[in-house]
Amino acid sequence: MSTATLYDKVWALHQVAELPSGSTQLFIGLHLIHEVTSPQAFAALKDLGLSVRHPERTVATVDHIVPTTSQARPFADGLAEEMLSTLERNCHENGIHLNGLGSGRQGIVHVMAPELGLTQPGMTVACGDSHTSTHGAFGAIAFGIGTSQVRDVLASQSLTMNKLKVRRIWVDGALQPGVFAKDLVLHIIRTLGVKGGVGYAYEFAGPAIEALSMEERMTLCNMAIEGGARCGYVNPDQTTFDYLKGRPHAPSGDAWDHAVSWWKSLASGADACFDDEVKFDAAVIAPTITWGITPGQGIGVDEAVPTLEQTPEEDRPLAQEAYRYMDLQPGQAIAGLPVDVCFIGSCTNGRLSDLRAAAAVAAGRQVASGIKAFVVPGSEQVAAAAEAEGLDAVFRQAGFEWREPGCSMCLAMNPDRLEGRQISASSSNRNFKGRQGSASGRTLLMSPAMVAAAAIAGRVTDVRSLPPA
C-alpha cells in the first residue's frame, strides 16, 4: 500500500524540476487573480517584455474594492474605479477571462471559483490572497501568494516552493446543533495556536470532517492559514463529486467518469504516513468566539476571557495587549458583551448555506435597536439563489440590510467600515487591530448563526439559547 498522502501525490504530479537550492519548481494548474494584487504583477510583466504563459489557466474576478450598496459605474471612490478599470484592461490585453460585475458570475474569488467548478481535486491553485487555502476543500493544494509570485505565475505558470510537512487533523464525533464548521476551525486554531501550523499542510479527516458539506469544508480550509498552515485540504469523496457534477467548468460525459476515478485515487490511503497527527472530538465543541486580536484567542460562548494564570507564559504579553485593546477584563464572561455592528459575509462564510443558517435565526425576529446589521452574499450566484429562496426578504423583515456581493467589511478596502471604537460580530476570518477599517475598531469572529443571534440580542449570545421566535 502507498504511504503517500494526497499532498504528496499532488506535489509529485506538479513537480517541474528540483532546483539547486533544494526548492521545487511547481506547476500551477489554476491561477486566480483579482484587482488588488494583480496590477503590479502585470506592470512588471510588461517591463520585462514577457507575456502571460497560460491565459486559459488564469481566471479573474473583482471583489476586494467593490462597494456593496451600489455598484453603478463609475464608482464614487476614484481609486477603486481605477483598480477595476486596470483589471479590465489587463484581462482584455492578455486574453484572460474576467467574471466582472453584472456577469452573473462575479464574486469573492474563493466563492466564485468553486461554484463555477473551476476548483477540482488534484489541482494546484494559486492566488494573490491569503485565504486561497479555501480550495483545499476539494482535495486541491492551494496557496496564497504575494504580488511578485503573481508575476511569476503569470509568466511561467509555476512557483518556486519548498515542500511542506503534513499534519493530519483528525476529528471524531459529530458537531452538535448550533455548532458549525466556523466553530470547529476556531477551536482548532485556539488549541494549536496561530503559529502551530507553520511549515505544515493540514489534512482534515475523520468522521466529523466527512459529515461536513462542501461549503462547510471550504470554511474549514479557508482558515487553515490563520492557524499558520500554508494550506489545508480534505480528501475528495462523494460529497465532493456531488457538488462538482454539472457545474460549468466540471468535466461531463465520459470525461466525468474518468475524472472521478482519478480523483478517488488521490486520497490519502489507510497506510499514509503523516509527519504529525492531532485528534479532536467534535461533540465537545461549543459555539466559539474570538475575544482578542488574533484568531487564536478564542473561547466557547459559555466561557470567560482567560486570565493570565490560564494563559501559557509565552502568550501572556499578547493577552495583556488584547485586554487593553478590546477593553475586556480577565475572567469576564463573553456572553452578554454588547456589539454595535453585525456583518454576515466574506470568503469564509458568505455562501448559500451560511445565509440559510443566519436566516433561520433571523426569521420572525427583529434586529435590536441601535444595531447595524447587514448581509453581503459572497457572489452574484449566491445572491440570486438566496433571493430565489426568499432569504433576502427574511433578512430585510428582521431589520438587516441586504447588500451586493463583495468582500465588504472583512477587510475594509471598500466603503464598509467600522467607526471609532465600534465592536463587530463578524463571520469573517481575521480580528487583527484595525482589520475592519477603524484603527481602534474591535472584531469578534463567530459563525453566521451566532452573528445573527448577536444582531437580534444586541450582544453576544448563545444561538442555542434564543427564545422561540
Swiss-Prot record:
Domain of life, source organism: Bacteria
Cofactor(s) needed: [4Fe-4S] cluster
Subunit structure: Heterodimer of LeuC and LeuD.
EC number(s) reported in the record: 4.2.1.33
Co-factor note (free text): Binds 1 [4Fe-4S] cluster per subunit.
Pathway: Amino-acid biosynthesis; L-leucine biosynthesis; L-leucine from 3-methyl-2-oxobutanoate: step 2/4
Enzyme class, spelled out: lyase
Residue sites binding [4Fe-4S] cluster per the record: 347, 407, 410
Keyword terms, alphabetized: 4Fe-4S, Amino-acid biosynthesis, Branched-chain amino acid biosynthesis, Iron, Iron-sulfur, Leucine biosynthesis, Lyase, Metal-binding
NCBIfam families, per database record: leuC (TIGR00170), PRK05478.1 (NF004016), PRK12466.1 (NF009116)
GO biological process, one term: L-leucine biosynthetic process
Statement: the UniProt record of this protein carries the keyword Iron-sulfur: yes
A Pfam family the protein falls into: Aconitase
Function: Catalyzes the isomerization between 2-isopropylmalate and 3-isopropylmalate, via the formation of 2-isopropylmaleate.
Catalytic activity entry: (2R,3S)-3-isopropylmalate = (2S)-2-isopropylmalate
Family label: Belongs to the aconitase/IPM isomerase family. LeuC type 1 subfamily.
Protein name, UniProt field: 3-isopropylmalate dehydratase large subunit
Molecular function per GO: 3-isopropylmalate dehydratase activity; 4 iron, 4 sulfur cluster binding; metal ion binding
